[in-house]
Amino acid sequence: MSATSILIAAAESGHSDENVLIPPLSELLIGTLSFALLVAFFFWKIRPQIARTYAQRTERIEGGLARAEAAQREAQALLEQYRAQLAEARTEAARIREEAHSEGRQITEELRAAAQREIAEIKARADAQLAADRAQIVAQVRREVGEIAVDLASKIVGFQLESSATQNRLIDDFIAALDNSAEGVGTVAAPVRPGG
């Protein structure tokens, strides 16, 4: 049977003076007392456990938030430290790079100066060698020219210059005359006669 059929059957049974919606007083007292006992039991046993669980969960959440904030602060501090180290490393790298450039320029200048000194030394040695070679060639040419001049003078004058001192003096005078004419003096010394 359904609830509707039960209500209809109760209405037909003849209890028309009672109100169905208002319970009897004994049931009302038992229901109220049961509800009061249930509420008292709730406040005495269940509410402290719920409050304790709620406090623990709140504490756990707040602790988790505090730990998360602490971890975030620590991560931020590590990030700042990393950024500072990175900036320091960049500054150090720039300083090292500048020192390397400076040392490179200094080494280049030193090598350039050493090369210039070496070039100057080589040039000085070459100039000295050229001067020595020139002096040797000039002396050799003078000697050969003197010998040719003595031979020529002997043939022109018709007699042999026998004295080597006379030959040497004649050669020296002739070369001096050639030097003077080369310098633009224009005077040629008179040839030395044999015997004076």
From Swiss-Prot:
InterPro entries: ATP_synth_B-like_membr_sf, ATP_synth_b/b'su_bac/chlpt, ATP_synth_F0_bsu_bac, ATP_synthase_B_chain. The keyword Acetylation does not apply. The keyword Transport applies. It holds the Pfam family ATP-synt_B. GO terms for molecular function: proton-transporting ATP synthase activity, rotational mechanism; proton-transporting ATPase activity, rotational mechanism. Belongs to the ATPase B chain family. This is ATP synthase subunit b. It comes from Frankia casuarinae (strain DSM 45818 / CECT 9043 / HFP020203 / CcI3).
